[in-house]
A protein has these predicted regions:
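Bacterial N-terminal signal peptides
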Residues: 10-19
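A metal-dependent, Asp-based hydrolase signature
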Residues: 79-82, 87-168, 173
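Bacterial N-terminal signal peptides that target proteins for export
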Residues: 1-11
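C-terminal cap/substrate-recognition subdomain and adjoining C-terminal extension
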Residues: 25-34, 38, 44, 48, ...
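Non-catalytic pre-domain segments flanking phosphatase-related domains
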Residues: 8, 21-70, 78, 92, ...
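Short, function-defining helix-loop hinge/capping sites that tune catalysis or transport
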Residues: 77, 81-84, 226, 283
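Generic anion/oxyanion-binding catalytic loop in active/binding sites
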Residues: 12, 32, 136
Length: 350
């Protein structure tokens, strides 16, 4: 009887293990919203190679680091501009609780955005920094929870140029499948965006991405009772609150992305995803990884049927990215959908 019991125990364990193995997904099964395309094949081939312990390119779990830009990489940016531009325009020009307090520099930045999206007037040179400094001022004095709530409340709006989704829902659905696939293969991914760190945290919160895996533009934070004291000279009290200030610390673009990755992650990525020249430095840092095989992917916004894209411009960029050694993801040819079948592109309304 004891031998029979042991036999059935072993049989039961074997069947359980077999059931677990049979439930494991094939790589292709993660990608229901992708067409059969070269970019997806490149990603799957890479992941299968570096996760195979028998491969000379095997990467230990702890070093499977991936960096993702946000705007235009896995969330919309053509409605009609970046989320952080749209919310600043609203804050400075339309928010009844703030617009009368906006400074000249904030008004300059917000009006530049409005002129750009409504009439196509080019943004001033170095506008990324003009916007960053204006944004630092526009939200100064807010606590972290207050700013988070402000962003999430604005994100409940329907983005201009679309029907069937809110800003908070405007994720590229095929890219969310990439998140799931990489997570299933024990990669750790970080959001490394040019947008405000706390805006990014608010937008990706619904995806379950932890705040400590989000890197972005930063402003100085200080206690509400700190006054003019430096942080090194002030002791935070249990009754204190952290406030945003109007002091810009860093705009997280280009080589600043590399700097922040080195400082905050402490490891060179093995995979990198982006969509613009602001991501090239991050990609090159990844491809320069001397320890492990690496890949970099660039999305191009070439789908002018489902998104407000400039196809001609996107195709030129695609060629530029290929020449730089990046794998190009075509949103028109590689995706079956962008935002989901129930989302419809419509004309902008101003």
């Amino acid at each position: 009887m004891k031998k029979a019991g042991k036999f059935f125990t072993v049989l039961f364990i074997s069947l359980v293990m077999l059931s677990f193995l049979s439930c494991g997904k094939k790589s292709s099964e993660y990608f229901k919203l992708w067409n059969d395309c070269d970019s997806l094949k490149a990603l799957i081939e890479y992941v299968e190679d570096v996760t195979d312990k028998k491969s000379p390119n095997y990467i230990p779990v702890e070093d499977r680091i991936v960096t993702f830009d946000m705007d235009g990489t896995f969330i919309g940016e053509l409605y009609p501009s970046y989320f952080e531009y749209n919310i600043l325009e609203y804050r400075v020009l339309d928010d009844p609780d703030y617009k009368d307090r906006a400074s000249e520099s904030e008004l300059f930045a917000a009006n530049a955005i409005r002129d750009f999206v409504r009439s196509g007037k080019p943004l001033p040179d170095h506008f990324d920094m003009i916007h960053a400094r204006a944004a630092a001022k526009a939200y100064a004095g807010m606590t972290i929870p207050e700013f988070d709530a402000y962003v999430k409340n604005f994100a409940k709006r329907t983005p201009n140029g679309f029907e069937g989704m809110t800003y908070a829902e405007s994720f590229y659905k095929p890219m969310l499948e990439v998140f799931d696939y990489l997570t299933a293969n024990n990669f750790t991914f970080y959001v490394v965006s040019g947008s405000d760190r706390f805006i990014c945290r608010a937008l990706v919160d619904s995806l379950g991405i932890e705040p400590n895996r989000v890197i972005g533009m930063d402003v100085l934070l200080k206690s509400d009772n700190q006054g003019d004291d430096e942080g090194v000279n002030y002791t935070y009290k249990t009754t204190d609150r952290l406030l945003r200030t109007d002091v810009l610390l860093i705009k997280n673009l280009k080589t600043n992305k590399v700097k922040n990755i080195a400082q905050e992650i402490g490891k060179v990525p093995v995979l990198s995803f982006g969509n613009s020249g602001g991501d090239s430095a991050m990609h090159n840092y990844c491809l320069a990884n001397t320890k492990y095989k690496s890949r970099a992917f660039m999305l191009i916004a070439d789908d002018d049927e489902d998104d407000h894209a400039n196809r001609e411009k996107a195709l030129k960029l695609g060629q530029q990215w290929k020449e730089a050694g990046y794998v190009v993801i075509s949103m028109r040819d590689d995706f079956k959908t962008i935002y989901g079948e129930n989302v419809k592109k419509v004309d902008f309304k101003f």
